[in-house]
């Protein structure tokens, strides 16, 4: 089976759904952000602060290409889709799943999360604007799932049906 790439904006449920799908399909799950942190030996927020977003995006592209393209679920960072080369890679090497969630619901979920470098609770308008600027890229995915106000079980049932497992 080709890899399954789970994309979506921060807080949409990528990690949660990736883990649930991993258990359901008995496949390994790999998180690109976690792998970058392990390789660089620092937290994503520190990479952003010390090296900048462009350097982080380079690390992200390199990591994406280093991962297996068969029998693995890959949960991606929210911005991985900003680079056309990454979108092309994922579409050619697997099934791309876009988890959509209403940005206002995401903002509520992330209100107290200090680990998100691009989320500033004081500036919800900028958060929504960033979300909208990426939306067309996310929508290039093979499969779209709206996670807004749905349980993990509901999302999983819909996802399994769409990926035919």
UniProtKB/Swiss-Prot annotation:
Keywords: Amino-acid biosynthesis, Aromatic amino acid biosynthesis, ATP-binding, Cytoplasm, Kinase, Magnesium, Metal-binding, Nucleotide-binding, Transferase. It comes from the Bacteria. Its cofactor is Mg(2+). It is an enzyme of class 2 (transferase). Its main location: cytoplasm. Belongs to the shikimate kinase family. Mg(2+) binds at residue 15. Its EC number is 2.7.1.71. This is Shikimate kinase. Substrate binds at residues 33, 57, 78, 134. It catalyses: shikimate + ATP = 3-phosphoshikimate + ADP + H(+). Pfam families: SKI. One of its GO terms (cellular component) is cytosol. Pathway: Metabolic intermediate biosynthesis; chorismate biosynthesis; chorismate from D-erythrose 4-phosphate and phosphoenolpyruvate: step 5/7. Signal peptide: none annotated. Monomer. The keyword Glycoprotein does not apply. GO terms for biological process: amino acid biosynthetic process; aromatic amino acid family biosynthetic process; chorismate biosynthetic process. It is found in: Cytoplasm.
